[in-house]
Amino acid sequence: MAEISKDQVKHVAHLARLELDDEAVEKMSDELSAIIDFAEQLNELDTDSVEPTTHVLNLKNVMRKDEPKKWISQEDALRNAPDHKDGQIRVPSILE
């Protein structure tokens, strides 16, 4: 049985910016241990004859030609922009 310690739960909670009381830490420790035990059952499967896959479905990317098309003019594109300069839309800074 995989045992997830209370310290491990507290560490993960800290990384996730979660505040857990002692009761919640105890409960999460038990639940996470049970989840890992359940997942470890996959190690018992014989997968020697299973071909490795990267995707469950056999889908492939369907690409189209990259062809230039007639689009709206730069003037029309900037017409509804609240602020623009030198042909480009200006937006508020998000970095300090």
UniProtKB/Swiss-Prot annotation:
Origin superkingdom: Bacteria
Protein name per the record: Aspartyl/glutamyl-tRNA(Asn/Gln) amidotransferase subunit C
EC number from the UniProt entry: 6.3.5.-
BP terms from Gene Ontology: glutaminyl-tRNAGln biosynthesis via transamidation; regulation of translational fidelity; translation
PANTHER family: GLUTAMYL-TRNA(GLN) AMIDOTRANSFERASE SUBUNIT C, MITOCHONDRIAL
Reaction catalyzed: L-glutamyl-tRNA(Gln) + L-glutamine + ATP + H2O = L-glutaminyl-tRNA(Gln) + L-glutamate + ADP + phosphate + H(+); L-aspartyl-tRNA(Asn) + L-glutamine + ATP + H2O = L-asparaginyl-tRNA(Asn) + L-glutamate + ADP + phosphate + 2 H(+)
GO molecular function: asparaginyl-tRNA synthase (glutamine-hydrolyzing) activity; ATP binding; glutaminyl-tRNA synthase (glutamine-hydrolyzing) activity
Keywords, alphabetical: ATP-binding, Ligase, Nucleotide-binding, Protein biosynthesis
Family per similarity comment: Belongs to the GatC family.
Subunit structure: Heterotrimer of A, B and C subunits.
Job description of the protein: Allows the formation of correctly charged Asn-tRNA(Asn) or Gln-tRNA(Gln) through the transamidation of misacylated Asp-tRNA(Asn) or Glu-tRNA(Gln) in organisms which lack either or both of asparaginyl-tRNA or glutaminyl-tRNA synthetases. The reaction takes place in the presence of glutamine and ATP through an activated phospho-Asp-tRNA(Asn) or phospho-Glu-tRNA(Gln).
Source organism (scientific name): Oceanobacillus iheyensis (strain DSM 14371 / CIP 107618 / JCM 11309 / KCTC 3954 / HTE831)
